[in-house]
């Protein structure tokens, strides 16, 4: 799914995992999302929910990790070694800067605007770096994993 409305003005947008062993009969086996309450994301402004994913074929990540751009909840690193029970092993939410744009919603005939991070797309490389960009003009961030995410990837 993809969040398309600001401030949670739509049903929750999830990450879905599917078994496509039989290509003509795909079957959803699990889902995952960032708990809204973990960061009051609906109140932060902008979109909150799954957007783009990256499941890298590089050996460092293949069949181990997936990364999801989650708009105002930043980028999320998921351990997918058990696709029936994906779990978050890391995340990064960029800080707002003077260049970060406002996102507005109509409220009682007037626009209510908030400055909000909108992590949009991401890419990884075979060294274990994650590159994320923000659609609200905050820029690009190059990330290096730490903690549990680094352990899942098998990086020293």
Question: Model-derived features: where do they sit?
Answer:
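Feature marking well-ordered beta-strand scaffolds used for ligand recognition
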Residues: 1-156
